[in-house]
Amino acid sequence: MASSLLAGERLVRALDPGGELEREQLPRKLRAQLEAALGKKHAGSDNATGPRRLVSFRLIRDLHQHLRERNSMLYLHELLEGSEIYFPEIVKPPRNPELVARLEKIKIQLANEEYKRITRNVTCQDAQCGGTLSDLGKQVRSVKALVITIFNFIVTVAAAFVCTYLGSQYIFTEMASRVLAALIVASVVGLAELYVMVRAMEGELGEL
């Protein structure tokens, strides 16, 4: 978590002799702390890109409070021009090899248990596998019988309609009456065939 600023040149110049902060009559302790912070190089500052001149937020707050108490026309945001928040590098602790190995072992165990759970119902017993072909044959015969029954039903209803239509010409002279009579007879025959077909299918399903 950030707790300090990387001071810019504006703040450094303001604290130098003759700078903007000199006429603000800073308390001796606050000035000494700011000078110590701005004059001290942070660890790793020998590097050209390394951080230096770190000022804590506490010192910035004290400086801001002093400027407000004096009703100064020098504003803090002007002094902090060019400054940046300093985020220290977070060093990750090394991982425990024993803990890593234990976690990998747990992952493998969980994966094996999940695989066994998924494939538990896939394997079949020898007796069940042996009866697959016979069961398939029964299903094929049942489907074939159902198709033949439906075909016979359609043919029977159509034949009843045609016969009634042709035979009713000796009774009715109007075509509408002949068609109506043929529909009535075909419906009765269809219902009878449907009843017989349903009973037959119930018997076959009961055997299965």
UniProtKB/Swiss-Prot annotation:
GO terms for biological process: cellular response to increased oxygen levels; intracellular iron ion homeostasis; lysosomal lumen acidification; lysosomal protein catabolic process; vacuolar proton-transporting V-type ATPase complex assembly. It is found in: Cytoplasmic vesicle, COPI-coated vesicle membrane; Endoplasmic reticulum-Golgi intermediate compartment membrane; Endoplasmic reticulum membrane. The keyword Endoplasmic reticulum applies. The keyword Acetylation applies. It holds the Pfam family Vma12. The modification N-acetylalanine is found at residue 2. It is a multi-pass membrane protein. GO terms for cellular component: COPI-coated vesicle membrane; endomembrane system; endoplasmic reticulum; endoplasmic reticulum membrane; endoplasmic reticulum-Golgi intermediate compartment membrane; lysosome; vacuolar proton-transporting V-type ATPase complex. It comes from the Eukaryota. One of its GO terms (molecular function) is oxysterol binding. Keywords: Acetylation, Cytoplasmic vesicle, Endoplasmic reticulum, Membrane, Transmembrane, Transmembrane helix. The chain crosses the membrane at residues 146-166, 179-199. PANTHER family: TRANSMEMBRANE PROTEIN 199. Accessory component of the proton-transporting vacuolar (V)-ATPase protein pump involved in intracellular iron homeostasis. In aerobic conditions, required for intracellular iron homeostasis, thus triggering the activity of Fe(2+) prolyl hydroxylase (PHD) enzymes, and leading to HIF1A hydroxylation and subsequent proteasomal degradation. Necessary for endolysosomal acidification and lysosomal degradation. May be involved in Golgi homeostasis. Binds 20(S)-hydroxycholesterol (20(S)-OHC). Accessory component of the multisubunit proton-transporting vacuolar (V)-ATPase protein pump. This is Vacuolar ATPase assembly protein VMA12. The gene is Vma12.
